[in-house]
Amino acid sequence: MQDHNRHVWDERVRKGLLHTRTARDDEFKNPLKAINGRGWITGSIKGKHVLCLAGGGGLQAPLYAAAGAHVTVVDISQEMIDQDKRIAQERGLELNALVGSMDDLSIIENASFDLVTQPVSTCYVPNILKVYDELSRVLRFW
């Protein structure tokens, strides 16, 4: 299943299809507003450690980085990760971009993140409980 999903997302990027667009110039003018349209994030995220889980593509991770967060993005698609790297380089942003599956975050240490963001994506894993087990391990709880 994961190999199939990886291939499909890589192809979607190559074709420029829906859900593969990168962040726009206007979104970088106020990156926190662009990523926080519903107002769920209160205050600044400057200096916070943010995991963009299955959030590759050059949209979310660069905007979080532009808002001052220390960002790691994990995505199953190399093409989506490459877009994050390209946008970060073009904008002079730092982010850690990793190819991996959201249900196996063994490449990440325990209690590494203050915030996790995840677009609709758990429908792509065979066992959602593994995802949430991994999230509970990598999140910091204050």
Features from the language model and the residues they span:
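A short acidic, Gly/Pro-enriched loop at the edge of an enzyme's catalytic core
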Residues: 103-116
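A short, aliphatic-rich alpha-helical micro-motif
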Residues: 44-45, 109-110, 132
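Class I SAM-dependent methyltransferase SAM/SAH-binding core
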Residues: 48-105
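A short SAM/SAH-binding and catalytic strip from SAM-dependent methyltransferases
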Residues: 114-129
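A short glycine-rich, Lys/Arg-flanked "PGG" loop and its adjoining helix->strand segment in the class I
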Residues: 129-142
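Conserved class I S-adenosyl-L-methionine
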Residues: 1-46, 59-60
